Each structure stands twice: as C-alpha cells, then as structure tokens.
Amino acid sequence: MRVEKRALKDISRLQRSDQRRIVDFLENRLARRDNPRELGEALTGPLAGLWKYRVGSFRILTRIDDSALAIWVVQVGDRREVYR
C-alpha cells in the first residue's frame, strides 16, 4: 500500500484518535485483504476509477492498481468535503 503526499497531509490534519482509526483500518483491514474491493465501493462520474472506504464519518479514496498489486491512498477526509 502506498500513500500519496496529499493523503498524508489530510491524515496529519485530523485528531489523533481519528488518525489511529484510519491507519488501523488501512494496515489491519485493507492491506490484509486478498480482494480490497470487498470492503469498498467504486466511485462514478468525475471520480470514476477511484474506490471509497468508510471509516466513521471519514472517507478514504484509493486507486487500485491490479497490474502492480498496489493500493494507492489518494485522499482522506470528512464525507462532506472529500468528494469536492
């Protein structure tokens, strides 16, 4: 799993407890899945190609690269703001 600079910045702006919840989800649930799409939902429209994962009121947007077997964390934020 790789985390883009923007996503790291997004995570660093959150409260410590929210940071822990998101990192725990990424490391212990998402990264250990054989098929990460089982936990997420594909986005449509201008964000087509990205997948979203729900952690409380936060959303984690990722790009899944099957050829490299990698998950790129693109953006993290509150559900009201992350899709803008």
Q: What residue ranges belong to the model's regions?
A:
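Enriched for short, Lys/Arg-rich terminal
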Residues: 2-9, 13, 20, 24, ...
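A short, compositionally biased N-terminal segment around positions ~18-40 that is enriched
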Residues: 17-33
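A short, surface-exposed loop/turn module that caps and links secondary-structure elements
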Residues: 28-52
